[in-house]
Amino acid sequence: MINNQESLRSQTFFCIKYIISLSFFFILIYQLLNFLVLRPYAEYLWNHYQTDVFLNSSQEERIFAKLQNFEEEMQFDMLISYTYPLNPQVLHKEMEEKAFELAHMSNNESINSIAHVFTDLLIAFLIFCLLINAKKEIAIIQTYIDQYIYSLTDAKKSFFLILFTDIFVGFHSSHGWKILIELCLTHLGLPENKGFIFLFVATFPVILDTLFKYWIFLYLNRISPSAVATFNNMNE
């Protein structure tokens, strides 16, 4: 009994230490690659070989919307101000300065998006190499996770199952998926295609829900039928 507890404690310490070390390693590598190597290269390519101001149509729409909002705010402030009456020359100068500021911001956003694409690809390649060469460590972590899941009571297993399904495939999950896809597209500098986003939100949670139910039927129902019964009762 004591040996089992010591073994479990040792596995827990190893898993936590390994995951934290990997997380810090990949975060550090990502920042170094992005800011010291790939971003300067992307900045050189964009500023020397690209004539367009915007990377995609979505970025252009966002910048124009910000410029329009700024113009409306300026006009409103001048209309209600007794000290500074409405002056077209002042408005034009302020608009010109704001346009240059937004153009500079758009330029940096485009450079960052290009650098993110190459950095993400390199990090994905490093993770793939890690999965191939660290099979022993991954097997230890997988064994620990299995033991931890098996040690949970049926009520706790059912709670985590319901929590997972409600977050990823629940009624309100579509809003979260929509925000996540928009953030990913912006991160990679891709246009925010509304049709693609709506199609993804309409189909991906359904596919995920189907795979989850298939996993319950094929795997969980075999190793822990009581947990499945508790899960169904809690769902009802």
From Swiss-Prot:
Subcellular location: Plastid, Chloroplast inner membrane
GO CC annotation, single: chloroplast inner membrane
Transmembrane intervals: 18-38, 114-134, 161-181, 196-216
GO biological process, one term: potassium ion transport
Alphabetized UniProt keyword annotations: Antiport, Chloroplast, Hydrogen ion transport, Ion transport, Membrane, Plastid, Plastid inner membrane, Potassium, Potassium transport, Transmembrane, Transmembrane helix, Transport
General function of this protein: Contributes to K(+)/H(+) antiport activity by supporting proton efflux to control proton extrusion and homeostasis in chloroplasts in a light-dependent manner to modulate photosynthesis. Prevents excessive induction of non-photochemical quenching (NPQ) under continuous-light conditions. Indirectly promotes efficient inorganic carbon uptake into chloroplasts.
Gene source species: Mesostigma viride (Green alga)
Topology in the lipid bilayer: Multi-pass membrane protein
InterPro entries membership: CemA
UniProt-recorded name of the protein: Potassium/proton antiporter CemA
A Pfam family this chain is assigned to: CemA
Similarity annotation: Belongs to the CemA family.
Main localization category: plastid
A single GO molecular function term of this UniProt record: proton transmembrane transporter activity
